[in-house]
């Protein structure tokens, strides 16, 4: 659907990641489906960088973690909690997972111009979808529940599965990245 906004859009990669390339306002743009989670998103970013890409925008979905983050709102991430494993292959855990400020500001400007309700802030990034949704069924459920409460108290806006990896991979590769998400449900 996003690729339909591009002029002269053509599918250029079919095997691992479906990718369309075309132009938008006379700028060459590629749209890639990376699948779910940090590992596949990191592979896509690495391979797209090798093809010359230098700016990335992750568009996806998330679950709201604060009561004012409603279904249908947009969340623009200003940082990500590294509760996943991919980013650890690129940088020590002390290194922050933060997006490029210019890309983030452009995302905020775009969301404002459309009049969508939105929030900016930190998101929680994890590897397991069901660990969060059914922690009581997991051997580490106690830890998951306590971390969830800590993230909420610290003001974390939403939960998703790619940003931390993409932010750290982008830092390691010297490219720009930002992310925004449609809230599909509020988990509170």
Give names to the regions the model predicted:
Residues 14-188:
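Glycine-rich phosphate- or other oxyanion-binding loops that anchor nucleotides, phosphorylated ligands
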């Amino acid at each position: 659907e996003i690729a339909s906004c591009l002029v002269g859009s053509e599918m250029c990669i079919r095997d691992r990641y479906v990718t369309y390339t075309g132009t938008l306002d006379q700028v060459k743009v590629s749209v890639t489906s990376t699948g779910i989670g940090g590992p596949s998103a990191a592979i896509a970013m690495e391979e797209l960088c090798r093809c010359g890409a230098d700016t990335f925008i992750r568009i996806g979905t998330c679950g709201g973690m604060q009561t004012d983050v409603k279904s249908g709102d947009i969340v623009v991430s200003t940082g990500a909690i590294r509760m996943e494993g991919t980013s650890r292959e690129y940088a020590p855990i002390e290194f922050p997972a933060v997006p490029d400020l210019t890309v983030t500001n452009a995302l905020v400007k775009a969301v404002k111009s459309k009049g969508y309700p939105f929030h900016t802030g930190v998101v929680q990034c994890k590897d397991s979808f069901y660990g969060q949704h059914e922690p009581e069924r997991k051997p580490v459920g106690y830890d998951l529940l306590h971390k969830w409460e800590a993230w909420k108290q610290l003001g974390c806006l939403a939960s998703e599965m790619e940003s931390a990896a993409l932010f750290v991979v982008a830092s390691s590769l010297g490219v720009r990245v930002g992310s925004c998400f449609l809230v599909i449900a509020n988990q509170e």
